[in-house]
């Protein structure tokens, strides 16, 4: 007696419906909600259905899954954002992704089936974002005021990169067979003017800061080119003959979604943490020279550890520091359109003005769009770095400590 051939796991059955269509169903891995999933293929001719079934099984064997119409872009983006991305992506970066996912990707493409997403849809995402008023109050209005500012290509670029990252995972899992983002040119990030204080203005500011109780905080920004969180998170035990900028203060709303290998320390205050820079290349150690050496020694005093700069004994809120910086500039009689991050650009310009080589500037301030970041990062360059910082101090002249 001839033994009837058996079907392999997941290969499903072949049957003919009442309307004459030949169909087969292939069992797949459970869906994002844990429910059963099947790929159903129907053709008018049995041979066509058999051919389609064979191709589908080959795809299943190759990719481990088959696309179905049950997963929408909205469902996949939420799954990626909540269950996949947090394993690799830092909380602050993830928060930016969440904003663009909920604000743009889902409203524009969310109802599309994931496996039906095309290059044209990605272009639609770009175009829709760049035709959206920057002012939320104007969105949805048909007749916009003349000169209404729209969202820049930078927003479109962030949306493109976020969608592409989520689709790469979908491609790897076999839920789609190509990433449509790869077929479309990425939006070009808009070049914005990077305003900075010039040498006379920097001197004017430092002289003004000498009389302020919080002057050491703002002077440290100008004299180091450090990032906002690096100075707010500076601790006394990381100040010697050098300044160790290997931690930064950040506000993290949901630390439970942090990657397992991410280093952080909780600080007093709601959602405030000390975190490591994105990569070890960002752990900078710069020499202390005058007047910064005296400024910091007076600030630290006999303090052995803990944050150097606090507000009413508590860690600074990063956003509060940004707002207070503007008030400092106004009080000093200086333009208030140089943002706190612009103090980095001021430091870069001062170092250039002092004749410091570009490679040394990059080692002092870290990656900056105002200077070229070299691929190497020497740790044995202490003398050159100290000379560079001294040149900048000489350029600024004698500033009261």
Place the predicted regions along the sequence by residue.
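Short, basic (Lys/Arg/His-rich) helix/loop patches that form interaction surfaces
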Residues: 134-135, 206-214, 224, 286, ...
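N-terminal DNA-binding module of tyrosine recombinases/phage integrases
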Residues: 17-124, 299-302, 308, 314, ...
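Short, Arg/Lys-rich segments that mark the N-terminal edge of DNA/RNA- and chromatin-recognition modules
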Residues: 1-42, 92, 253-268
